């Protein structure tokens, strides 16, 4: 968190996000961080893809894994169009990471995909919301944030256990998200422009996993980011590079007192 984050009173809340209800039936105070920024997820993904290709890598989409087997000191990964061979493989399959491990004959970690839902709504007519901050209630509740000048995204912070799948929102959770917005703001929700769900996958201890499987040579876990994959990707990339290639632990991670053992899949085998 920014050192410039500060507590604000209800009148300040009304100035920053004018639709929020304040007072006894609403918000009476808050914490405001003027230095927080929203990540451009598409720009990050495209930039990383370009960096991968520039380094000689390739991205093969629409290539579902049909089999993984260990042959000698190598792994062979089968897809409908081609098989790939390497002395090490990285399991970064998100909600499917445990399934990929099982396919490879590696013990799963007990990862749990949790469904989360987003709705897109319109602010009051003529109101530009582009400068509004990401706004979240303390504890359970909801959050909302602007997307451009004329649309808001809202989330009820649902965490519904799910099988790995192309998650779809359910009507009850959509209604809950709209109700929470109406309870916390002066905006009546007359229309939901769009709705979708995604899966956030957690290890049993809620910490991310990066490291070689203790029961399989050359099988590297990179999973369990719990919905914070974009935010943690620079640090997790440094950790994964060091751990997979046997390099010195990166100084930025050491400076934050992050220990490789905290990420190791071995911690989940005790």
Cite the ranges covered by each PLM segment.
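A short alpha-helix-loop-beta-strand transition element characteristic
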Residues: 1-14, 108-111, 247-255
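Hydrophobic/aromatic beta-strand patches that form the interior of the parallel beta-sheet core
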Residues: 60, 90, 220-222
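Mid-domain beta-loop-alpha active-site segment that forms a flexible
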Residues: 32-51, 94-96, 173-180, 229-232, ...
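Short loop/edge segments at beta-strand edges and connector loops
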Residues: 9, 61-63, 79, 194-196
């Amino acid at each position: 968190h920014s050192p410039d984050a500060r507590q604000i009173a209800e009148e300040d809340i009304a100035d920053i996000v004018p639709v929020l209800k304040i007072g006894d039936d609403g918000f009476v105070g808050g914490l405001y961080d003027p230095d927080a920024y929203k990540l451009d997820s598409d720009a990050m993904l495209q930039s990383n893809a370009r960096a991968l290709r520039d380094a000689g890598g390739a991205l093969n989409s629409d290539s579902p894994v049909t089999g993984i087997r260990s042959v000698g000191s190598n792994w062979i990964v089968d897809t409908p169009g081609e098989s790939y061979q390497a002395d090490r493989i990285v399991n970064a399959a998100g909600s499917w990471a445990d399934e990929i491990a099982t396919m490879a004959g590696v013990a799963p970690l007990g990862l749990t995909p949790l469904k989360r839902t987003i709705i897109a709504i319109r602010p009051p007519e003529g109101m530009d919301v582009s400068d509004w901050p990401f706004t979240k209630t303390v504890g359970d509740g909801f959050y909302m944030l602007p997307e451009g000048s004329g649309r808001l995204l809202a989330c009820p912070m649902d965490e519904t256990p799910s099988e790995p799948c192309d998650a779809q929102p359910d009507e009850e959770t959509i209604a809950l998200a709209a109700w929470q917005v109406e309870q916390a703001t002066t905006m009546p929700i007359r229309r939901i422009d769009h709705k979708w769900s995604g899966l956030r996958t957690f290890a049993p201890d809620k910490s991310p996993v990066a490291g070689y499987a203790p029961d399989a040579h050359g099988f590297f876990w990179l999973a369990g980011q719990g919905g914070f994959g974009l935010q943690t990707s620079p640090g997790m990339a440094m950790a994964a590079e060091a751990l997979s290639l046997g390099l010195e632990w990166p100084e930025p991670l050491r400076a934050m007192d992050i220990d490789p053992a905290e990420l190791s899949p071995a911690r989940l085998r005790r």
